[in-house]
């Protein structure tokens, strides 16, 4: 696979011997490919059979997956394959000593196929080098044969194919290879090379994206590249061709500056277009007069050229000639344009189709070459052999994709300040600048059909784009506040808004990002409507030129059409382009607004705050504001969910306490309750600590359950988004994560049940939990003596914040002591007081009224 292969020095016998070797190599390759294809087919059938049989669990446990023979003790023992993980018999597998595992026969064949097919070689080397080995030798010999036989006469260029010793399939990273190829080849060969290189680049991008299987964004990128592979290939090939053509034109201009040929002047006032298409022998192709592309292809007419020639009869200075060369450099052409100088016109010969012209010389007649699409049989045979279309079918044609939106939007954008200060040019000035009146007239068919690939500095481009302005004029915004709004974003080819800093949105949910951008744009517009309407009556000095621009758009359309773009400075051009991008962004946002619902409009209108919104906010600050709003919404939702879960757990706990206390009765109000005293033998501090610890455990358990539920929901969403090509190992990892999360949820539920059992044990032991006192916030002595019931503590719990963070949960759970309770602490005292004490305790247990039993 060397860079060069020169076989020009071989004799006929040596060439014949090389051809025999190449033919034998091709035959061997074909046989090997047939054998590998049969092996692949057998493996595919075996895999399909295994996929069907593996669904039956009993068959997998009792029979061999390969030969379907049943397993028997000591006679036909089963063994587990190390690759496919299926159970196979002894006859269907072999032991690999270096790997220390059993491998079935099918997996061995798969390994052999991967080794013999050289997949790594074809994926990494052959995709980059299309022609190497025998194919490269054969191509070189064929080129040599064509050179010797003389059958390689270039139909299009009029020269011979020069032998290209470079590897045409190499993409070493430089475009010099393609430039060298295009010098000695026809444009058809150059286009074929560009298409092949573009296809290889797209395939390499797809393979790189597919290598990152764990990233959802890379998978989406790979699918997009596969779906739009043909369009992207054509676009990239066009870019490569433009670079090749630009370099060829630069070389031609340099040669023209060095030679500076003198062309005879035409003193006649009119030149008739004639269809004298003559042919010349091959020996005349070195004539000094070369063909030039017609003026109609660049929106020039013969009348305009003659007018400009008669107006400027004196020869131009070298500075004007250099300026003309710079203007011509921006025009797409397959041939040099040095001879199309308006001051030095010669008698012309026009082709029958009107697309190509040549200079007429009295002594020598130049050969006529029509560079439109040829119809000869040789050219068509070359097209079929190279499996590509002609370069002239697509290059230089008017299409919807080539339409320059920035130039078309100049009709909708106000002119620059420097343009307003210039007086309106007279028709004579417009003609002297090299642009005739027919070049900008909408009724001129030549101007309407001009090339869409000319530079933005040419006023003929504006005339060519007028036919496409109707759609953009219908979509133009009618709100002046919207027209004045400064937007900091830019647009790519697909009308995707991007930040000014160059950061692209790479989120996995493009619809959500689009809705966020739409809502933000609507808030900006509504916030700026009020201030701008108030400032409209008293315009500031800074806003006066902008309003003046808006008022004079309709009056200055003709002025901008005939003005010369080269007279404006760089700064004015940059400002116009920035305004065009902003206007195009406004159009895209207005089109997307029509698809939103009225409910979202009302919601965004109610939340709009004009005093906080400013037109000079950068895109980064706006993105930060949107992220903060999303965080607040998410925190509010999570706080609501946490509060709901905590209240459910607390209410369930209180319900268990109420049920364990027995049927409710309305006991008489005791004097101790009226005085705010606890029953005899009740340790107030101890009961409060116990209830506080129980509530903390409830909060921790509820927070753990909520966090685990969130993890489960995230795992479920990730499982739904998994691509169909996800491997078995990734699925197994996800299943392990789900099982671990489920185990944690089960553990949290066990903790909750343990807390409930402890509460019931406390109730059965005789502890009166209802008349406890909250000791969390004691600010004065009066609050300490107040008795709080379950009803009042429930109201306080509703005001509690969200449970602590995960670190605090772990610390609290590790520090929480284990409470031990004495069942006989009420039996302290004399034996005579025991019945009385037990009776009083029973009454205290029945004291909570019926209102606290209602669970809500």
Swiss-Prot record:
Q: Which InterPro entries match?
A: FYVE_2 (IPR041282), Intracell_Transport_Effector (IPR051745), Myrip/Melanophilin (IPR006788), Rab_BD (IPR010911), Znf_FYVE_PHD (IPR011011), Znf_RING/FYVE/PHD (IPR013083)
Tissues expressing this chain: Detected in brain, skin, heart, lung, adrenal medulla, pancreas, intestine, liver, kidney, skeletal muscle and testis. Detected in cochlear and vestibular hair cells in the inner ear, and in photoreceptor and pigment epithelium cells in the retina.
- Which GO terms fall under molecular function for this chain's record? actin binding; myosin binding; protein kinase A binding; small GTPase binding; zinc ion binding
Q: Where is this region: Myosin-binding?
A: 143-560
Its principal location? cytoplasm
Pfam families for the chain: FYVE_2 (PF02318), Rab_eff_C (PF04698)
Region called Negative regulation of PRKAR2A-binding, residue ranges: 232-248
Region PRKAR2A-binding: start and end of each range?
193-209
GO CC term (a single one): actin cytoskeleton
Zinc-finger (FYVE-type) residue ranges come to: 63-105
- Where is composition skewed (Polar residues) in this entry? 551-574, 613-625, 784-793, 826-840
Query: What SUPFAM superfamilies does the database record attribute to this sequence?
Result: FYVE/PHD zinc finger
Which keywords does this Swiss-Prot/TrEMBL entry list? Actin-binding, Cytoplasm, Cytoplasmic vesicle, Metal-binding, Phosphoprotein, Repeat, Zinc, Zinc-finger
Ranges of Low complexity composition bias in the record: 427-437, 450-460
The observed outcome of changing residue 197 to P is: Loss of PRKAR2A-binding
Outline the segment boundaries, as ranges, of region: Disordered.
252-294, 351-578, 592-625, 778-806, 826-856
Q: Which domain of life is it from?
A: Eukaryota
User: Phosphoserine modification sites?
Assistant: 299, 351
Instruction: Give the UniProt record's GO annotations in the biological process aspect.
Output: intracellular protein transport; positive regulation of insulin secretion; vesicle transport along actin filament
Regions of biased composition (Acidic residues) lie at 395-405
Q: Which region ranges are annotated with the description Actin-binding?
A: 495-856
Sequence ranges assigned to domain RabBD in this UniProt record: 4-124
Keyword Protease included in the entry's annotation: no
Report the function annotation for this chain.
Answer: Rab effector protein involved in melanosome transport. Serves as link between melanosome-bound RAB27A and the motor proteins MYO5A and MYO7A. May link RAB27A-containing vesicles to actin filaments. Functions as a protein kinase A-anchoring protein (AKAP). May act as a scaffolding protein that links PKA to components of the exocytosis machinery, thus facilitating exocytosis, including insulin release.
| Subunit | Binds RAB27A that has been activated by GTP-binding via its N-terminus. Binds MYO5A, MYO7A and F-actin. Interacts with PRKAR2A. Interacts with components of the exocyst complex, including EXOC3 and EXOC4.
Query: What name is this protein filed under?
Result: Rab effector MyRIP
User: From which source organism is this entry?
Assistant: Mus musculus
What gene, per UniProt, encodes this protein? Myrip
């Amino acid at each position: 696979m060397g860079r060069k292969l020169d076989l020009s020095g071989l004799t006929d016998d040596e060439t014949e011997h090389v051809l025999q070797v190449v033919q034998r190599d091709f035959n061997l390759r074909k046989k090997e490919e047939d054998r590998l294809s049969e092996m692949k087919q057998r493996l595919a059938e075996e895999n399909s059979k295994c996929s069907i049989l593996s669904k039956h669990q009993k068959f997998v446990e009792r029979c061999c997956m390969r030969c379907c023979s049943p397993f028997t003790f000591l006679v036909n023992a089963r063994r587990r394959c190390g690759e496919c993980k299926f159970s196979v018999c002894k006859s269907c597998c072999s032991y690999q000593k270096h790997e220390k595992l059993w491998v079935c026969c099918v997996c061995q064949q798969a390994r052999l196929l991967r080794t013999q097919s050289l997949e790594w070689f074809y994926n990494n080397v052959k995709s980059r080098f299309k022609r190497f080995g025998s194919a490269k030798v054969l191509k070189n010999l064929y080129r040599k044969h064509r050179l010797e036989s003389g059958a390689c006469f270039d139909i299009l260029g009029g020269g011979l194919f020069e032998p290209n010793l470079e590897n045409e399939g190499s993409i070493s990273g430089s475009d010099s290879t393609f430039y060298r190829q295009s010098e000695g080849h026809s444009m058809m060969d150059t286009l074929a090379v560009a298409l092949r290189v573009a296809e290889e680049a797209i395939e390499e991008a797809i393979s790189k994206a597919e290598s990152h299987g764990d990233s959802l964004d890379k998978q989406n990128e790979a699918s997009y590249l596969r779906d739009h592979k043909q369009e992207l290939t054509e676009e990239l090939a066009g870019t490569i061709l433009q670079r090749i053509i630009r370099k060829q034109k630069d070389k031609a201009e340099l040669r023209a500056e060095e030679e500076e040929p003198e062309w005879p002047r035409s003193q006649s006032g009119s030149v008739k277009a004639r269809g004298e298409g003559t042919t010349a022998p091959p020996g005349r192709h070195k004539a000094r007069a070369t063909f030039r592309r017609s003026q109609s292809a660049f929106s020039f007419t013969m009348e305009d050229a003659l007018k400009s020639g008669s107006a400027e009869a004196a020869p131009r200075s070298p500075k004007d000639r250099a300026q003309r060369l710079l203007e011509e450099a921006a025009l797409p052409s397959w041939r040099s344009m040095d001879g199309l100088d308006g001051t030095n016109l010669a008698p012309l010969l026009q082709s029958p189709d009107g697309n190509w012209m040549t200079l007429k010389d009295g002594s020598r007649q130049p050969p006529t070459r029509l560079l439109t699409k040829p119809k000869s049989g040789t050219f068509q045979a070359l097209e079929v052999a190279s499996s590509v279309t002609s370069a002239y079918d697509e290059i230089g044609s008017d299409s919807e994709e080539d339409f320059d939106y920035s130039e078309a939007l100049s009709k909708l954008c106000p002119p620059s300040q420097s343009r307003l200060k210039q007086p309106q040019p007279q028709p004579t000035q417009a003609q002297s600048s090299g642009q005739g009146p027919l070049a900008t007239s909408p009724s001129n068919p030549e101007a309407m059909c001009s090339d869409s690939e000319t530079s933005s500095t040419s006023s003929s481009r504006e005339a060519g784009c007028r036919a496409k302005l109707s759609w953009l004029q219908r979509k133009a915004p009618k709100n002046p506040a919207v027209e004045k709004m400064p937007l900091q974003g830019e647009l790519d080819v697909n009308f995707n808004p991007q930040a000014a800093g160059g950061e692209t949105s790479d989120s996995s949910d493009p619809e959500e990002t689009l809705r966020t951008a739409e809502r933000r744009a609507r808030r900006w517009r509504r916030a700026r409507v009020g201030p701008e309407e108030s400032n409209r009556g008293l315009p500031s000095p800074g806003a006066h030129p902008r309003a003046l621009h808006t008022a004079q758009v309709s009056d200055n359309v003709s002025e901008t059409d005939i003005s010369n773009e080269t007279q404006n400075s760089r700064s004015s051009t940059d400002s116009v382009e920035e305004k065009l991008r902003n206007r195009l962004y406004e159009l895209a946002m207005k089109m997307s607004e029509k698809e939103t619902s009225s409910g979202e409009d009302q919601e965004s209108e109610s939340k709009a705050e004009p005093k906080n919104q400013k037109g000079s906010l950068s895109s980064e600050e706006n993105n930060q504001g949107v992220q903060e709003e999303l965080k607040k919404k998410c925190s509010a939702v999570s706080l609501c969910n946490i509060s709901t879960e905590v209240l459910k757990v607390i209410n369930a706990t209180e319900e268990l306490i109420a049920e364990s206390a027995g049927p409710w009765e309305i006991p008489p109000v005791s004097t101790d309750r009226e005085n705010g005293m606890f029953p005899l033998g009740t340790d107030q501090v101890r009961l409060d600590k116990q209830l506080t610890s129980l509530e903390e455990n409830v909060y921790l358990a509820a927070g753990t359950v909520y966090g685990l539920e969130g993890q489960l929901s995230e795992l479920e969403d990730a499982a739904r988004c998994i691509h169909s090509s996800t491997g078995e190992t990734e699925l197994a990892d996800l299943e392990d994560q789900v099982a671990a999360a489920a185990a944690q949820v089960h553990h949290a539920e066990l903790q909750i049940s343990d807390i409930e059992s402890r509460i019931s044990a406390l109730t059965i032991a005789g502890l009166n939990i209802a008349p406890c006192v909250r000791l969390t916030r004691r600010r004065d002595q009066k609050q300490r003596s107040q008795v709080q019931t379950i009803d009042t503590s429930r109201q306080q719990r509703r005001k509690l914040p969200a449970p602590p963070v995960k670190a605090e949960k772990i610390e609290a759970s590790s520090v929480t002591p284990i409470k031990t309770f004495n069942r006989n602490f009420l039996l302290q005292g004399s034996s005579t007081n025991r019945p009385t004490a037990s009776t009083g305790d029973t009454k205290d247990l029945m004291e909570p009224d019926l209102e606290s039993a209602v669970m809500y």
